[in-house]
Design a protein with these regions (language model features):
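Residue-level signature of outer-membrane beta-barrel architecture
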Residues: 225, 243, 292, 296-298, ...
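Outer-envelope beta-barrel architecture signal
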Residues: 113, 149, 178, 190, ...
Length: 584
């Protein structure tokens, strides 16, 4: 077992957002016309995005208030105190985990008199050092990409994509497995979350996995690239999805996009890469995205739903790579290039969300998400080592089952005390498998028993070339895992003081089998078209591992006085895994 702990230093800056499980907050000071602070002012934030309609707080002896656990959207904020005119702020926009500074100035008068303030300069977050980019529906829809946090996140300065990913332009990459890193950090430190709970697999350090909530079913996603708080065990990029909740009226949206090669530009002809020998460039063949969503009330102010689905595909021509005309012919040992090779990617997502206001102080929400994905066939074309993989030597990267179910509970016991709990159960199956039927150009599928050839200097392409069948050692795998993540927290918030304590844990099982084609456990080694040797591949091997616990406990506190904010936190983590009995 490995145990680690960390103490976040105290400082005269705020490093801790107040939001519940990465929700937004409104905080400020209420004064009278003379500048004196006003205790006892009732501050209410109301919005159509809240199934409970309104959240409220009362200013403390220093005139300060904080309203936490607010979902993204437009709010109407009112300030009310007997003997003073009511002040209303309209169209207050909240996004991400921001702590919005919103002060109130009350004039003497009757509460029946109302002063409405609108059209002012938007209030900004002055209390958090977290560097965060919030991508709402408007932003995601406006950017020509496949509308995932990975394709949009790379537009943030200092952020880049890690392994398993390509550069997406205009929806040309259906990126189901991706990672982001910021400021030179590690991709393994990335954490994807739904309502603040990790949506992680049991592999690769827990940075992610195949499941990604679809864009229409998401109200917004926030990408934190620095200044993360004690609720996180790692310091890498955090991507938090806020599910779309429906509402008190029926509404829907149907985003759709399509592109083909006639819409693509030419940045190849007459360029340096052509002069250096790139025989044909990569380009799009066709891609499309259909992502409808619909929601509304089952019972007004009580029970909401939102349903969404998504179908994406992208067919791309692969640079300097061609279908082999001699594929599936066991009598032919030479490579004969035909038409340009195509990489096919497709993804299907079904998602449902239900929100239930069980009582004034108990709100529940649940999300069901099921997905499948295939990059068919991938690992083709020019490879990092300099060799080229012909399409029949590639691998289908398939995710036939990606499923997660979330359950969250929020209870504002009072205007100061907030209780919350959330959990995710996830099941994932994926693997690198033999090329799928219909994805090899001039044939329906690869004939079992075809033996791959690895030529260090193919006489046709004048490069290292792998063709006829896959030539890697145990190139295929069948992997599955299940895991459960959960967390609980309690927040005690006054206007000047914010205290939060929480606990998170995860456990699960991962199993992976690597293998080669049973009908062809060998590879022919060639040089310049002549045989030089044979490589015999290993038999299937299965590795099993359990994550017994991945637990963390955190305590954080913040105190605000005047223009100063003092914050500090302590986090303790414990991790343990085990390996069931297994053999080679």
């Amino acid at each position: 077992m490995r145990v680690r702990s960390v103490l976040l230093a105290l400082g005269f800056v705020i490093a801790l957002p107040l939001g519940a499980f990465a929700q937004a907050s409104i905080s400020g000071v209420v004064r009278d016309s003379s500048g004196g602070v006003l205790p006892g002012v009732t501050v209410e934030a109301s919005s159509p995005v809240l199934i409970e309609k309104t959240r409220s707080a009362v200013t403390d002896t220093n005139g300060r208030y904080t309203i936490s656990d607010l979902r993204p959207g437009a709010y109407r904020v009112s300030f009310t105190l007997q003997g003073f005119k009511t002040v209303v702020r309209e169209s207050v926009e909240l996004t991400g985990t921001q702590v919005l500074a919103l002060n109130g100035d009350l004039e003497v008068g009757g509460v029946q008199e109302t002063i409405t303030v609108s059209g002012e300069t938007p209030a900004v977050d002055l209390q958090s050092t977290t560097r965060q980019a919030v991508m709402d529906q408007e932003i995601v829809s406006a950017i020509p990409s496949s509308r995932t946090p990975f394709t949009v996140g790379v537009l943030i300065p200092g952020v880049r994509k890690g392994a398993f990913t390509g550069q997406d332009v205009g929806g040309s990459v259906v990126q189901e497995v991706a990672s982001l890193e910021a400021n030179g950090g590690r991709t393994s430190d990335q954490r994807m979350m739904v309502n603040g709970v990790a949506l992680s697999s049991m592999i690769a350090g827990g940075w992610g996995g195949g499941a990604v909530p679809n864009a229409t079913g998401t109200s917004e996603f926030a990408i934190d690239v620095s200044g993360v708080d004690a609720q996180a065990a790692t310091g890498g990029v955090r991507i938090n999805f806020i599910p779309r909740d429906g509402g008190n009226r029926f509404s829907g949206t149907i985003p759709f996009s399509y592109a083909n090669d006639s819409m693509a530009g030419d940045n190849y002809t007459g360029t340096d890469v052509q002069a250096r020998g790139l025989s044909v460039p990569g380009n799009i063949k066709a891609n499309g995205d259909f992502n409808p969503g619909f929601g509304g009330p089952i019972s007004r102010d009580k029970l909401w739903f939102f349903l969404s689905g998504r179908k994406l595909f992208a067919d791309n021509y692969v640079a300097s790579t061609f279908f082999n005309l001699n594929v599936n012919d066991p009598t032919k040992f030479a490579y004969a290039p035909g038409s340009q090779a195509i990489l096919h990617q497709e993804q299907t997502i079904y998602q449902a969300r239900v929100t239930w206001q069980a009582s004034p102080r108990n709100k529940f929400g649940t999300t069901y998400d099921q997905e499948n994905f295939c990059a068919c066939s991938t690992v083709i074309g020019p490879q990092p080592g300099g060799a080229i993989n012909s399409p029949e030597a590639g691998v289908d990267r398939r995710f036939p089952l990606q499923r997660f179910v979330t359950l969250d509970w929020t209870s504002p016991v009072s205007s100061k005390l907030l209780l919350e709990a959330s959990g995710i159960h996830r099941v994932e199956r994926w693997g690198g498998m033999e090329p799928q039927e219909g994805k090899l150009g001039n044939i329906d599928s690869l004939t079992p028993g075809m033996i791959g050839i690895a030529d260090t200097n193919d006489p046709v392409t004048k490069t290292a070339l792998n063709y006829r069948a896959n030539t890697a050692v145990n190139p295929y795998n069948n992997s599955w895992n299940w895991n459960i993540h959960y967390r609980v927290a309690m927040s005690y918030i006054t206007g000047s003081h914010a205290f939060k304590v929480g606990f998170n844990n995860a456990y699960g099982h991962h199993e992976n089998t690597t293998y080669s084609s049973p009908a062809a456990p060998i590879v022919y080694n060639f040089t310049a078209g002549a045989p030089t040797g044979i490589t015999y591949r290993l038999t299937p091997r299965t590795v099993k591992v359990n994550v017994d616990h991945d637990a963390g406990l955190f305590v954080q506190d913040k105190w605000t006085t005047g223009r100063w904010t003092l914050a500090g936190a302590i986090r303790w983590d414990s991790f343990a895994n085990s390996f069931p009995e297994q053999g080679l």
